[in-house]
Amino acid sequence: MELETLRSPVNFLQHMLGALPHERALREYESWWETEGEHISDATDRAGTPWLRMFDRGGRRVDEILFAPEYWRGLRQGYKAGVVWRTFEDQSLAASALLGYITCFYDPGLTCPYVISLATAVALDRHGSEALRARFLPPLLRRDDTVWQGATWMTEIKGGSDLGANVETVARPAGDRWLLTGDKYFASNAGADLAVVAARPEGAPQGVRGLALFLLPKRREDGDLNYTVRRLKDKVATRSVPTGEVELRSSEAWLLGSQDRGVHLILEVLNLSRATNALGSMAIAQRALAESADFAAQRIAFGKPVFEHPLMRKQFDERIETLQDGFALGWESILRLNEVWRQKPPYSDRYHLFRLVAHLAKYWTSDVAPQIARWAMEVHGALGVLAEFPVERWFREAMVLTIWEGTCHRQILDGLEVMERKGAHHLLFERLRDAADPIDLAEMRRRVETHLALPQTQREAGAEEIFRALAIFTARTVRHAAEAISQPGRSARRA
């Protein structure tokens, strides 16, 4: 891969996908990052956790998050470019995913408010009443500085993986709305204008089946704050998204969808974010490789550039292959999501296929991205651990994306479940049939089915090995198929 391709997210996207939708808008967005946005991002990362002004001088609760003015200008660039509104105008998630990839190459933290604002808009559009959509959807789709931001608040103090056991926020009916009381411990995009929130209606059963999803605005009908921010988290990275602890005290909210389908709606929100997280991890990997290539081409060791040493070049080329495989798998999850993002329960087989691909993609990409970023630090030697140089940041950022929207452990177990309960692996093998080598496909099918036939304890304990193998097999198969279309000569050489 040419270094100029590696240095540019748009060039890399074009290399992987061929013709891009809205290419002019994508290049204009990249240009803004190169000329202005990157400086804002660096300053935001170095400044650390922003201040929280809880009260104004008159003693009124305001909960203002105090970033520098340049931060807010930078944040709005993505909204103006279309990270939310283009999805509804195009009736496709592709442009939003591409804009998110570019964003993550420069500032992974900013992808979070963009993605969860999109997830808020999609959940509202799919499951909100006509009155709710008319009132709250237009502000999320604005293209100027008045655009609203969304958020998705599920996690509480006891943890986010086991929502059925750990969500203690209670919802009480109050006329045409509900009143929510509880605390959200990891509330990304604290200060958002609108949030979708997991809560348990009074009298609902314990466990995940008793949860429902609610739409909660920042302000009550009377204009007062509808939720308060207890504090902001001091994170190792993604400092451009304020993550806080949010207190709900009889906070006004509206039910989305039906009360008995809440868990499905919550998972819809999470799975959209998982697919975009997979692409984001690869954007970080690309950035880390670009930084290491630039440095290694200039650094002289033993009489020649580090990049020209055979072992270094081999290691670099191996990681470029991993980058391209990971991107192909992440993009496959976007393609499968694009087929089903408007579906409602009960879901089709295509939706269960998307779920499996999303788990595979989120698991593998977020696992390999920190490894690539750590290697990029190693290329820099001792300079790689100094905060004054850019490469250490990408390792910090990659580690956060491993945790976001469910750990690797969670992705494996959820992926195992969708294979066991929905037979999603059969759908995946059918999807890959025309692109995969028949012998390799048969062997992978045999391995998966053999594993699923094991006793439950053995099946879970050994799940990572088979899940990793299936992720890599899927990644390489869909990449080869895509290259056969977009780069036929190159694909033939690989074959």
Name these PLM-found stretches:
Residues 1-89:
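Extended, charge-enriched "interface" segments that sit outside catalytic cores
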Residues 4-8, 383-442:
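Glycine-rich phosphate/cofactor-binding loops in nucleotide/flavin-utilizing enzymes
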Residues 57-146, 188-190, 404:
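Internal helix-loop-helix
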Residues 128-176, 331-351, 358, 373, ...:
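Internal maturation/activation junctions in enzymes
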Residues 177, 181-226:
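A short core secondary-structure module
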Residues 222-226, 230, 235, 242-273, ...:
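A glycine-rich, basic-preceded beta-loop-alpha segment at the flavin cofactor/substrate interface
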Residues 274-344, 426-487:
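Extended amphipathic alpha-helical segments enriched in small hydrophobics
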Residues 352-383:
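Charged, glycine-rich active-site and insertion segments that engage polyanionic ligands
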